[in-house]
């Protein structure tokens, strides 16, 4: 099982990203192995916003369509943040006083990963390392 965060999705689609080739190769390998990929609605919110902000419209639109196809084909699972998970993420926010830069979306991702027992994540964020 693999969780992909916003950075992973953006780097996969943006050829200008320094790690684009590495991420694309890794993603294709996971696909070949029929690995299950997870993300959340919060991650996709960030991803869709940034795709259309950073990339030409046609590339951003194709990216969203590919994500939708992955969901329809059962390759990508979207975990929808529940009110309970939202509350748990709020508790984490209060707990990690020493990490003011961690986003609330990242905290919800941590909650979901813990629930699903996912240990592998495609990210550049230090808090997941």
Locations of the language-model features?
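Short, well-structured N-terminal submotif of metal-dependent ribonuclease cores
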Residues: 1-39, 52-66
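Short beta-strand scaffold positions
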Residues: 4, 38-39, 80, 104, ...
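A generic structural signal for short hydrophobic patches within well-formed alpha-helices
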Residues: 9, 44, 128-129
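Ribonuclease/tRNase effector modules and their secretory precursors
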Residues: 21-22, 70, 75-78, 122, ...
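Active-site neighborhoods of divalent-metal-dependent phosphate/nucleic-acid chemistry enzymes
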Residues: 76-120
